[in-house]
């Protein structure tokens, strides 16, 4: 197939649409109880609405999801301007929008989210424990389809700091303080799938045990009744022990569904951003090279890696944030992030890589993605994406920005083929100077 001609989108403010967006319409009939909520909605509401439109949701679903966003997420963003720096985004923003792309499939909006309140980071709650429990209880009252907290509650119990441990750890010595977070998948049928994330490093440090030990014991505990994860997990654990893959950036996630449908993911970050290291991690140090699915996925990953032209080398990243002029220059380049997904009864994990494009020219990244998608036969996504990126940020010129897209995630299975997501800067204000 011939690659589509990719022109530079217009980089100037566009005329407002003739009809109100769902974000505008809903806010016309809603009184925000605090100025903080009103300001957060100004920063994120219209942007969320544009992501829903880019995700090709029907108008009914757009209103439904915007209502959820307005009433359950906006109140949990905490004080404005933000004081708490969240682990979930490069700028420390406690919210992150992403769009998922597959061949012939509806684009799907996901929101990564760490709830925050006015106590977050204070002496009363230096590691932001309280809002996690509060939002979890609130979600349980909504009667979301298939919602089950059992696995996530077990992980929180094992990984969250106790009050005594909170008192032991000096918060100023910890660059990454988050204890937990959520992910919300907005499905085309109107269902919301919730994911939970836990960050074990602080617990391991307070308890005086290695991160690897804490994670292995926790996976065994949640799998004790069903024994559906341990075979694949043992492959991951052996490789990560061998390669020093466990570190302060290692974290876990699970779906908030009942245990028979549960998936567990082990995440990590590495500052060696090279193709050789990616290939090693993708194959678990060679343990999976006999699996055709793994090797086919690696070959296609090499294609997008080459197109993105990410500079290879060791990054100086130490857990810092990039939130404007005050950011340390050596903390702007991101590490590479990966996860290994374990499904019930799987013989090996499915790897996923998050290629770091924070700091790369946004239009060039968009064109590289479009070129790759066109090579896969994803003509609809390929033709639409560069203009879509500009429409998401109508007040910016995406040919002059370099922080709107933070990560490009990639995974591959024989059943579904290539599966990709783009993670975005998730507030209207652009915190950096344009190039």
Swiss-Prot record:
<feature type="binding site">
    <location>
        <position position="423"/>
    </location>
    <ligand>
        <name>dimethylallyl diphosphate</name>
    </ligand>
</feature>
<protein>
    <recommendedName>
        <fullName>Deoxybrevianamide E synthase</fullName>
        <ecNumber>2.5.1.109</ecNumber>
    </recommendedName>
</protein>
<feature type="site" description="Required for regioselectivity">
    <location>
        <position position="112"/>
    </location>
</feature>
<feature type="binding site">
    <location>
        <position position="265"/>
    </location>
    <ligand>
        <name>dimethylallyl diphosphate</name>
    </ligand>
</feature>
<comment type="pathway">
    <text>Alkaloid biosynthesis.</text>
</comment>
<dbReference type="InterPro" id="IPR017795">
    <property type="entry name" value="Aro_prenylTrfase_DMATS"/>
</dbReference>
<feature type="binding site">
    <location>
        <position position="354"/>
    </location>
    <ligand>
        <name>dimethylallyl diphosphate</name>
    </ligand>
</feature>
<dbReference type="InterPro" id="IPR012148">
    <property type="entry name" value="DMATS-type_fun"/>
</dbReference>
<comment type="function">
    <text>Deoxybrevianamide E synthase; part of the gene cluster that mediates the biosynthesis of notoamide, a fungal indole alkaloid that belongs to a family of natural products containing a characteristic bicyclo[2.2.2]diazaoctane core. The first step of notoamide biosynthesis involves coupling of L-proline and L-tryptophan by the bimodular NRPS notE', to produce cyclo-L-tryptophan-L-proline called brevianamide F.</text>
</comment>
<feature type="binding site">
    <location>
        <position position="110"/>
    </location>
    <ligand>
        <name>dimethylallyl diphosphate</name>
    </ligand>
</feature>
<keyword id="KW-0637">Prenyltransferase</keyword>
<dbReference type="GO" id="GO:0009820">
    <property type="term" value="P:alkaloid metabolic process"/>
</dbReference>
<feature type="binding site">
    <location>
        <position position="96"/>
    </location>
    <ligand>
        <name>brevianamide F</name>
    </ligand>
</feature>
<comment type="similarity">
    <text>Belongs to the tryptophan dimethylallyltransferase family.</text>
</comment>
<feature type="binding site">
    <location>
        <position position="267"/>
    </location>
    <ligand>
        <name>dimethylallyl diphosphate</name>
    </ligand>
</feature>
<feature type="binding site">
    <location>
        <position position="195"/>
    </location>
    <ligand>
        <name>dimethylallyl diphosphate</name>
    </ligand>
</feature>
<comment type="subunit">
    <text>Monomer.</text>
</comment>
<feature type="binding site">
    <location>
        <position position="419"/>
    </location>
    <ligand>
        <name>dimethylallyl diphosphate</name>
    </ligand>
</feature>
<dbReference type="Pfam" id="PF11991">
    <property type="entry name" value="Trp_DMAT"/>
</dbReference>
<dbReference type="GO" id="GO:0004659">
    <property type="term" value="F:prenyltransferase activity"/>
</dbReference>
<keyword id="KW-0017">Alkaloid metabolism</keyword>
<dbReference type="InterPro" id="IPR033964">
    <property type="entry name" value="Aro_prenylTrfase"/>
</dbReference>
<feature type="binding site">
    <location>
        <position position="197"/>
    </location>
    <ligand>
        <name>dimethylallyl diphosphate</name>
    </ligand>
</feature>
<feature type="region of interest" description="Disordered">
    <location>
        <begin position="1"/>
        <end position="28"/>
    </location>
</feature>
<keyword id="KW-0808">Transferase</keyword>
């Amino acid at each position: 197939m011939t690659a589509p001609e990719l022109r530079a989108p217009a980089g100037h403010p566009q005329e407002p649409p003739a009809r109100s967006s769902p974000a505008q319409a809903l806010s016309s009939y809603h009184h925000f109880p605090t100025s903080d909520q009103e300001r957060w909605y100004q920063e994120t509401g219209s942007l969320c609405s544009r992501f829903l439109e880019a995700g090709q949701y029907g108008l009914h679903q757009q209103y439904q999801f915007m209502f959820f966003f307005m009433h359950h997420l906006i109140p949990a963003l905490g004080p404005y301007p933000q004081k708490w720096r969240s682990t979930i985004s490069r700028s420390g923003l406690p919210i992150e929008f992403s769009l998922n792309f597959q061949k012939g499939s509806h684009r799907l909006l996901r929101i990564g989210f760490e709830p925050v309140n006015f106590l977050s980071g204070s002496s009363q709650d230096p590691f932001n424990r309280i809002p996690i429990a509060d939002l979890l209880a609130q979600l349980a009252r909504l009667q979301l389809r298939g919602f089950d907290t059992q696995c996530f509650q077990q992980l929180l119990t094992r990984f969250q700091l106790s009050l005594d441990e909170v008192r032991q750890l000096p918060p100023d010595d910890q660059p990454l303080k988050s204890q937990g977070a959520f992910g919300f998948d907005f499905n085309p049928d109107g269902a919301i799938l919730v994911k939970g994330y836990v960050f074990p490093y602080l617990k391991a440090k307070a308890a005086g045990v290695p991160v690897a030990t804490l994670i292995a014991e926790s996976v065994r505990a949640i799998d004790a009744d069903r024994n559906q994860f341990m075979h694949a997990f043992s492959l991951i654990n052996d490789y990560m022990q061998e390669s020093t893959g466990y570190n302060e950036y290692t974290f876990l996630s699970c779906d908030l569904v009942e245990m028979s449908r549960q998936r567990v993911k082990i995440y990590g970050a590495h500052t060696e951003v090279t193709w050789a290291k990616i290939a090693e991690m993708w194959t678990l140090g060679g343990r999976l090279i006999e699996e055709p699915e793994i090797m086919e996925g690696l070959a296609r990953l090499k294609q997008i890696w080459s197109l993105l032209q990410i500079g290879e080398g060791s990054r100086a990243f130490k857990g810092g944030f990039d939130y404007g002029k005050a950011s340390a220059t050596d903390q702007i380049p991101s590490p590479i992030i990966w996860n290994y997904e374990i499904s019930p009864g799987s013989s090996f994990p499915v790897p996923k890589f998050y290629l770091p494009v924070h700091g790369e020219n946004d239009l060039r990244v968009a064109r590289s993605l479009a070129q790759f998608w066109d090579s896969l036969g994803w003509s609809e996504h390929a033709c639409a994406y560069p203009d879509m990126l500009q429409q998401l940020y109508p007040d910016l010129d995406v040919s002059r920005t370099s922080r709107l897209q933070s990560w490009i995630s990639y995974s591959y299975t024989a059943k579904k083929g290539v599966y990709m997501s783009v993670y975005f800067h998730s507030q209207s204000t652009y915190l950096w100077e344009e190039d």
